[in-house]
Design a protein with these regions (language model features):
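Short C-terminal beta-strand
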Residues: 176-186
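Two-component histidine phosphotransfer core
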Residues: 1-170, 174-178
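Hydrophobic alpha-helices of bacterial signal-transduction systems
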Residues: 185-193
């Protein structure tokens, strides 16, 4: 959890307590869920190795709910992941990075906001997880990033899967961007789930 995100969320909760206690409560409950889901990952060995996709989504869902309270009608979200893929092996924190990038560089700077979708499917024997947004798209983002997050994903994919793990970034036909991580599909084995 990025410190900047955490402090902004706490400041938003503080403000909403005065003006809209119900929304403050929703945001607070989602922050608690986000911290509960992400703290075990932060305490673990930190090897960056695979976990299961369901665990990754348990961090993403409350994160998106917090953003929906902050951005109000400007953010619409959907997660399309078949139940059978929740136990599939997937590298930790990669989906979170893609979601953060989509919001920070595509959706937040766009005055009317947009839609963010997370989708998982099996394509040619690989688990493909995509994060698509209808944000500003390539070359239009108001906040130019350093590219460290995407470079980190590429490096970790190379270390974990060699040439069998990929990150592709493409223009979304609906406007915005689609980022897809593809890794060999396999259900997670043992006690890591």
């Amino acid at each position: 959890v990025e410190p900047h995100f955490l402090f902004n969320t706490l400041a938003s909760i503080d403000h909403l307590i005065e003006v809209d206690p119900k929304r403050a409560s929703v945001m607070q409950k989602n922050l608690i869920a986000l911290l509960r889901a992400s703290m075990p990952t932060m305490r673990e060995a930190g090897d960056g190795g695979p976990r299961d996709l369901g665990r990754e989504l348990s961090v993403i869902r409350p994160y998106l709910e917090i953003l929906k309270v902050r951005m109000e009608e400007r953010l619409d979200t959907a997660i399309h992941v078949p139940e059978g893929l929740l136990s599939a092996e997937f590298p930790q924190m990669m989906v979170q990075t893609l979601v953060e990038n989509a919001v920070k560089h595509g959706l937040e700077p766009k005055p009317e906001g947009g839609r963010l979708e997370v989708k998982a499917e099996i394509v040619h024997g690989k688990l493909a997880v995509s994060v698509s947004d209808t944000g500003l798209g390539f070359g239009k983002a108001a906040t130019a990033g350093t590219g460290v997050g995407l470079a980190n994903i590429r490096e970790r994919l190379q270390l974990l899967y060699g040439t069998k793990g990929t990150l592709t970034i493409a223009e979304n036909p609906a406007g915005g961007t689609i980022a897809t991580i593809a890794v060999p599909y396999k259900p997670l084995q043992g006690d890591n789930a």
